[in-house]
Each structure stands twice: as C-alpha cells, then as structure tokens.
From Swiss-Prot:
Induction: Transiently induced in G1 phase. Activated in fibroblasts during growth arrest. Rapidly induced in response to adriamycin-induced apoptosis. Inhibited by TP53. Up-regulated during cuprizone-induced inflammation and demyelination. The lineage of its organism: Eukaryota, Metazoa, Chordata, Craniata, Vertebrata. It comes from Mus musculus (Mouse). This is Nuclear protein 1. Residues 1-21, 38-80 are annotated as: Disordered. Keywords: Activator, Cytoplasm, DNA-binding, Nucleus, Phosphoprotein, Transcription, Transcription regulation. Belongs to the NUPR family.
Length: 80
C-alpha cells in the first residue's frame, strides 16, 4: 500500500489562529466563537420558543370535538 508524502507546500499546511484572522470575516469568526448547541433539532428555536409555539393537546380532553358535536346537534334540532 502506497503512502502519500507529507505536504511540504506552505499553502497546504494547517493554519494557526493568527493566520486565520486575516482570512476569516466577522461572520466566520462569530460562528467559530459561538458554536451551535448540540441537540438543535428545533428549527433554530430555543426550547422555550418551541414550547410556546407548539400545538399541544389540551389536558381537558377533546373540547373542540365535543363543542362541534354539540353545535351540530343543536343545528339539527333547530331544523326539525
């Protein structure tokens, strides 16, 4: 199995932090300084925002379904 020779070209050597400052713009530096939190499968929202904007079932049961049934039965009674 052939091995590749180490890179001797200075342009292919890994950069130091001092060298990166000239290459990276302010957005790249911000993204490196503030990494994303692991477990961010929440559409880019925090847990609090996701909880506030999520349709959760109400603990009281199916109020909307019961209300619709009641309204429909009242309409049928009015037609008779």
């Amino acid at each position: 199995m052939a091995t590749l020779p180490p890179t001797a070209n200075p342009s292919q050597q890994p950069l130091n932090l001092e060298d990166e400052d000239g290459i990276l713009d302010e957005y790249d530096q911000y993204s490196l300084a503030h990494p994303c939190v692991v477990g961010g499968g929440r559409k880019g929202r925090t847990k609090r925002e996701a909880a506030a904007n999520t349709n959760r079932p109400s603990p009281g049961g199916h109020e909307r379904k019961l209300l619709t049934k009641f309204q429909n039965s009242e309409r049928k009674k009015a037609w008779r």
